[in-house]
């Protein structure tokens, strides 16, 4: 894969998760769409969203329960995209949702690799590729960040050190 393919793939998945078009992430204006459940969305997402904001730098795409469209629209149009994802700006969004009995909950940042920067690194551990039968006994609390017992049918490949 090259850098262009990586960002296109990420935008396509984000578009599926949010219920928008991949091109929405490169527009010059913010976009608001109604959040819906999509069977091709990431399996751990609880859809539809009340409010989910995503930016690849140009703008913000907001996938929302339309009851809260005005709150979100006012918020994302008040600040530059990068400032919508940091405090103290997020306190304003939190305050608006708190009036409806909700609070800002999860904040995540994902970083896409630059292919020209990737190099194989030495590893002092033996790596083992495992398949479902190999890791069926590893659904334990200490591995819950990697394996999910609630969706174990989706776990098909694992690399362990």
Tell me the role of every PLM-derived stretch:
Residues 9-134:
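Acyl-donor-binding surface of acyltransferase catalytic domains
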Residues 2-7:
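Extracellular glycan-recognition regions
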Residues 134-161:
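A mid-sequence, solvent-exposed acidic-amphipathic segment
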């Amino acid at each position: 894969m090259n850098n262009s393919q990586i960002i296109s793939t990420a935008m396509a998945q984000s578009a599926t998760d949010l219920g928008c078009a991949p091109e929405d992430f490169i527009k010059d204006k913010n976009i608001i769409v109604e959040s819906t459940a999509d069977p091709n969305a990431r399996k751990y997402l609880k859809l539809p969203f009340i409010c989910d904001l995503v930016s690849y730098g140009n703008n913000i795409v907001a996938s929302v329960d339309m009851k809260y469209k005005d709150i979100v629209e006012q918020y994302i149009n008040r600040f530059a995209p990068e400032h919508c994802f940091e405090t103290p700006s997020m306190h304003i969004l939190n305050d608006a949702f708190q009036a409806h009995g909700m609070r800002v909950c999860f904040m995540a940042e994902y970083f896409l690799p630059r292919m020209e920067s990737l190099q194989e690194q030495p590893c002092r551990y033996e790596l083992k590729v495992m398949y479902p039968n190999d890791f069926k006994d590893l659904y334990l609390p200490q591995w819950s960040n990697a394996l999910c017992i609630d969706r174990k049918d989706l776990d098909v490949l694992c690399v362990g050190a």
